[in-house]
């Protein structure tokens, strides 16, 4: 953990506080101390110059959700370059996105499953269900109740295969987005109980 001194100071080039918002990417040089649990920043600066995310309430709401999901679910301390690259790229993609913003949190959750180890394990075929227990698409309705419907399974497939720049082409209305988010959270919850502690889901459902 690192401590930032003078975060609210208005001296110099402005307050550092503006850099520490949900999902803002920063680069920093730190000073580690063997005598203290909290290390210190020597220098901190913006890693990605964000053009729209700080000013768009839809994007900032999604960023809050992304930050909480990662905080709740990612507990590893060792470096994970693939996960870092995905998150870094996701922030840049969200900032650059003009259309399809309302689908972005769904795309993020679907593709984050790849990095967390429970991406669907086989190919999708039209009309398939998704068996949450097995983590795979199936042409037959599972006998247990832990599954995604054929509609939700198709959306999961579309989100996994879609380039983030084209997520507007996945046509979902508000009711469908709410229902699919609930379904995706059930899938996550089967693998990671901590997803149920994410509070920003309610805000997402109000905005989208």
Predicted features by range, described:
Residues 1-208:
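Non-catalytic alpha-helical scaffolds and adjoining flexible linkers that form interface surfaces
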